[in-house]
């Protein structure tokens, strides 16, 4: 009984407007940021290095290099602060978690683009 009620509530909060993406894809995430009374939209563009699946609590981690410093940010997929997600490039990878990309620099950190 309890699980059915939770499923109904969680299914109402699912988002269907986001595109399909997987680990290894380059994406741009537009995030709504509220600072005091002001609200703005900030873009975070980078490589998806991990997707963690747990029903409606799905999260994904995006990594980018900013001023030669690696920055990682984890987003809940069904979060209302995410305005949109745009897939910029699909890459060919053979792993679901790309944590080894943290140690790579320069040309060794490149991934092959998936051919259509």
Swiss-Prot record:
Gene Ontology annotations of biological process type: translation
Gene that encodes the chain: rplS
Designated name of the protein: Large ribosomal subunit protein bL19
Matches recorded under InterPro entries: Ribosomal_bL19 (IPR001857), Ribosomal_bL19_CS (IPR018257), Ribosomal_bL19_sf (IPR038657), Translation_prot_SH3-like_sf (IPR008991)
GO cellular component: cytosolic large ribosomal subunit
Sorted UniProt keywords: Ribonucleoprotein, Ribosomal protein
Transmembrane annotation, as ranges: none
Pfam hit, one: Ribosomal_L19
Family: Belongs to the bacterial ribosomal protein bL19 family.
GO function terms (MF aspect): structural constituent of ribosome
HAMAP family: Ribosomal_bL19
Function of the molecule: This protein is located at the 30S-50S ribosomal subunit interface and may play a role in the structure and function of the aminoacyl-tRNA binding site.
Cross-referenced Gene3D superfamilies: 2.30.30.790
Organism of derivation: Mycoplasma mobile (strain ATCC 43663 / 163K / NCTC 11711)
């Amino acid at each position: 009984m309890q699980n059915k009620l939770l499923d109904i509530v969680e299914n109402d909060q699912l988002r269907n407007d986001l595109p399909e993406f997987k680990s290894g894809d380059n994406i741009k995430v537009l995030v709504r940021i509220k600072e005091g009374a002001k609200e703005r939209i900030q873009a975070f563009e980078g490589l998806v290095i991990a997707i963690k699946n747990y029903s409606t609590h799905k999260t994904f981690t995006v990594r980018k290099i900013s001023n030669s410093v690696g920055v990682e940010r984890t987003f809940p997929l069904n979060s209302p602060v995410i305005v949109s997600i745009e897939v910029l490039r699909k890459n060919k990878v053979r792993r679901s978690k790309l944590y080894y990309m943290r140690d790579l620099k320069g040309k060794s950190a490149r991934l092959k683009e998936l051919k259509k």
